[in-house]
Amino acid sequence: MAIDPSKFHLINVADTCAVWNVLSSPRLHAAAKEAHCEFCITSFVGYECLFKPRKKTPTPSETELMRRLAQEQARGSFTAHSCDIGDLQAIKILESRKRLGKGELSSIAFAMKIGQAVITDDMKARKLAEDSGHPLIQTTPHLFSWLIFKGRLGDSDKPTVMKQHQEMERPLSPHFETAYELALQCKLNAS
């Protein structure tokens, strides 16, 4: 999916991996908030992030990300929304089409219901959202690229964001690099 660094939908329903990727870098998250981006989650995602039993003891990075999410929720961000029967039926239909978790499926269904963007860094989830006719699909690298394009993040922020992201054992650094280059190209084309 090609991204346009000049455009980003401000209201996002985040799936589990997007929650972790946005919160992995305090600098990225702060810039997103300064740019008036809002993130919400479904109750399924909230459960996966904070309460779902894990096979292994959480790593220090996972524990820190859980702490950050709980802190943001206490501040009124990443609000969890319940799904109703219609949403669950949509999830069931979606579930039959792809092998995805309830978090991704509920995020897509809820975003479609409320007409807002779904932010996911899962390729299968993006493909399913696209196949389901949802036009507002975004990723964390797209957010990063847009923040660079808009000047909410500068060149000096790139290594900070990438370092913070890597310290939380998140996998998107190569995609951030590509998104950064796209933002610079888009800025150049706009001038």
Tell what function each PLM region has.
Residues 2-110, 114-116, 123-132, 137-138, ...:
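Active-site-proximal, substrate-binding regions of enzyme catalytic domains
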